[in-house]
């Protein structure tokens, strides 16, 4: 399994010989030193699946998110209408953010609250983060698109598709 592989179990400690042979870590000679930020995790899932929009600039977008069905004290809903077309798959930095109702998947991955200036982000590792990647509508849609992409582009045999999927991810 992947978790038991030598590459997965590597330390993030820098070995001088490995750094000399593989300074950019292309050959995966060491583990990552930290996990990606909240926005980058979402962007990576969309990029691998082929859904990430490369559209730059413009107003904030409202990507797909779970409906919470809550009503604010003065009649406003906490749910939003998902942006149409490719806007729903734009990079995380374009996501609309309300301090009173942050984007749930990014909040789970320690995105700043925007209440105060954040110089350094904390990084946690919680079971909730795993549940977000399994159940959040954006990640489910990205997983489905990745599966369709592997079937369409990965060849005809199961082995070819598995190898193609491994190389994509």
Task: Please place each PLM-identified region on the residue numbering.
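An acidic, gly/pro-interrupted, aromatic-rich
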Residues: 6-164, 168
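Short, functionally critical alpha-helical segments immediately adjacent to catalytic or ligand/cofactor-binding
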Residues: 1-4
């Amino acid at each position: 399994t992947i978790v038991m592989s030598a590459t997965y179990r590597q330390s993030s400690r820098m070995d001088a010989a490995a750094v000399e042979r593989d300074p950019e870590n292309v050959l995966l000679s060491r583990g990552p030193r930290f996990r990606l930020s909240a926005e980058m995790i979402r962007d990576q899932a969309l990029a691998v699946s082929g859904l990430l929009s490369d559209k730059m600039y413009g107003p904030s977008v409202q990507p797909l998110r779970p409906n919470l069905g809550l009503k604010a004290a003065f009649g406003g809903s906490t749910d939003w209408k998902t942006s149409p077309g490719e806007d729903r798959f734009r990079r995380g930095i374009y996501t609309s953010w309300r301090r009173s109702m942050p984007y749930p998947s990014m909040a789970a991955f320690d995105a700043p609250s925007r209440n105060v200036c954040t110089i350094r982000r904390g990084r946690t590792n919680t079971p909730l983060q795993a549940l977000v990647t399994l159940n959040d509508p954006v990640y489910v849609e990205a997983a489905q698109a990745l599966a369709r992409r592997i079937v369409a582009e990965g060849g005809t045999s199961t082995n070819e598709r598995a190898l193609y999927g491994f190389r994509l991810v």
